[in-house]
Amino acid sequence: MATAIPKITDQFHSAQDIGWYGSSYLLTNSCLTISFGKLYTLYPVKWIYLVALALFEIGSLVCGFTPNSVGLIIGRAITGLGSAGLFSGAITVISQSMPLQRRLLCISVIMCLFGVADVAGPLIGGVFTDYLTWRWCFYINLPFGGLTALAIVFLLEAQQPVKQAGGIKCLLSHLDLVGLLFLFPAVICLLLVLSWGGADYPWDDRRIIGLIVGFTALILVFIVVQWWKQDKATVPPRLIKKRDIWGTSIFSFCITGAMMAFTYHLPIWFQSVKGVSATKSGLMSIPTILGMTICSLLSAVLVGKIGFYTPFMYAAPVLSVIGAGLLSTLKVDSGPAQWIGYQIPFGIGLGIGLSQPMVVVQAVLEPDDIPLAIAITAFMESLGGSVAISVAQSVFRSQLVKNMALEAPQANAHGNITTAMTTLRDTVPPEMLSGVLRAYNLAITQALYVGVALSSLAIVGALPIRWTSVNEKKTEGCP
C-alpha cells in the first residue's frame, strides 16, 4: 500500500498516522507468527489456516470500507494478525503433504511469490490508486481469499496434529502467554526506537533512552521466561541452540531485511528523483522481479539435483551485496543502463537465497519440530523486514533534512519539499530543482546503505549451516 499512502492521507488528512499504517500490520504479524506455529502443532493445519485466512479477510474488509484513519489502522492490525498464520501455514501444508525432495520447487514458488509480491505490490497499488481508488488495494484480497478458502475446505485433508492440545489450560500453557506479554511490547519499543531515533528525536532524548531501556528490560525478561518454559516456550531453547536454526534465523532476518529496504525505497527514488508515476515506478522494478523469479525456480531445481542448499546460501549474500552496493551509487542523471543493470545481481541474489531457510529447517529437524521452526523462520523474516524499513526510513528522513539544508536551503520557502516527493517538479522553482533532486537522491541512497549492510551480514547466518543433503534420509536433528 506504499504507493497509495499519499491519496489516503489526502482523503483522511492524516499525515501524522502514516507510520502506523505499516507499523500496526508489522507489529501483530511479527509478534504472533510463532504463536500460529504452535497452533499448527496442536491442531489440524487446515482449520487453523482457515482461521488465519478469515482474520486476514476481515482486516481487508475493514481497511476497504473504513471512513477514517483510525479504522484503517485497526484494519491493518487485524490483517497482520491473519497474515501471521498464512505464510507459515502454507509452508507447513507443503511439509506435511510431500517428501522433502518434492517440496523444494513448491517452497521456491511460494518464496518467489512472497518476494515478487513485495516488489510488484507498488506497481499494482499504483494502478489501483491512479485509475480506481486506493480502497481496491484491500478489496482485491476479498475474492482471492474466498477462492482460497473454498480450495482449502474441499481439497485439503485435515491431518492429525503432531501433538495433542489437551484442555484450555494446556493450550494456554503451550501458547506461552507470559512470554508474549513481554515480547509484544519489546518489539513495539524496538520499532519505535528505530523509527524515531535520529529523525523525530535525537538519540539522547529521554523518550528514546526510555524506549531503549524498556526494550532491553523486556527482552531480557522474555529470554528468562523462554528458559523457564523450555519446550512450552514461544521459542524453545533446544531449537534455537541448534546451529542450523540460529544460522537460518540470522540469514532470514538479513536477506529479507535487505529486500524490504530496497523494495520500499527504490520506488521512492523512481518517483521523486526520476519524476515518474506510481505505476511506472513499479514497472521500473521489473528487473528485480525477473531476477528473483527465474533464479528462485532455478535454484530449487539445482538443489534437488546436487542435494545441497549450502552453496546457494553462500552465493546469495555475495550477489545481493554487489547489486545493493551498485544501486546505492545511483545519481540523479543515472540512466536505464544503471538502474536496470544494478537490479539484476540484486534480484538474482534474493532469488537464490530467500527460499533456502525453509528448506534447511525441514532437512535437519524431526517432523514434530518443523511447524514451529517454520514459524520461527517466518518471524525472523518479518522482524528483519520491519527493522530494515524502520531504520532505512529513519535514515532517509533525517538525511533528507540535512541534505536539503546543504543543497537547496531556500527550497522549503516554496512548500514543504521534504514531504512533496511526487510533485517536486511542480512545486520547486526551476533554478532550485537540481539541488532538491540531489538532496533527495543522496538521502535515498544513504537509506539504501541499510540494505547493503544487511546483504553483507547474511553471510554470517550462512556460515554455520551444515552441508546436509536433501537427497539423503534424515535420521536425526542437528546437534
Curated annotation (Swiss-Prot):
Which regions span the lipid bilayer?
47-67, 71-91, 104-124, 136-156, 177-197, 208-228, 250-270, 283-303, 306-326, 344-364, 372-392, 442-462
Taken from the record, one Pfam family name reads MFS_1
Q: Which UniProt keywords apply?
A: Cell membrane, Glycoprotein, Membrane, Transmembrane, Transmembrane helix, Transport
Signal peptide annotation: none
Is Cell division one of the keywords? no
Write out the GO cellular component annotations.
plasma membrane
Q: Which GO terms describe its molecular function?
A: transmembrane transporter activity
The record, for InterPro entries, names: MFS (IPR011701), MFS_dom (IPR020846), MFS_trans_sf (IPR036259)
Q: Please name the PANTHER family in this protein's record.
A: MAJOR FACILITATOR SUPERFAMILY, MFS EFFLUX TRANSPORTER INPD-RELATED
What is the annotated role of this protein in its UniProt record?
MFS-type transporter; part of the lnb gene cluster that mediates the biosynthesis of diastereomeric piperazines. Lna and lnb clusters encode sets of enzymes that produce overlapping sets of previously undescribed metabolites such as piperazinomycin-like metabolites or morpholine. The lna and lnb biosynthetic pathways appear to be part of a signaling network that controls the formation of sclerotia, a resilient overwintering structure. May be involved in the secretion of the metabolites produced by the lna and lnb clusters.
Protein's UniProt name: MFS-type transporter lnaF
The species is Aspergillus flavus (strain ATCC 200026 / FGSC A1120 / IAM 13836 / NRRL 3357 / JCM 12722 / SRRC 167)
| Lineage, broadest ranks | Eukaryota, Fungi, Dikarya, Ascomycota, Pezizomycotina
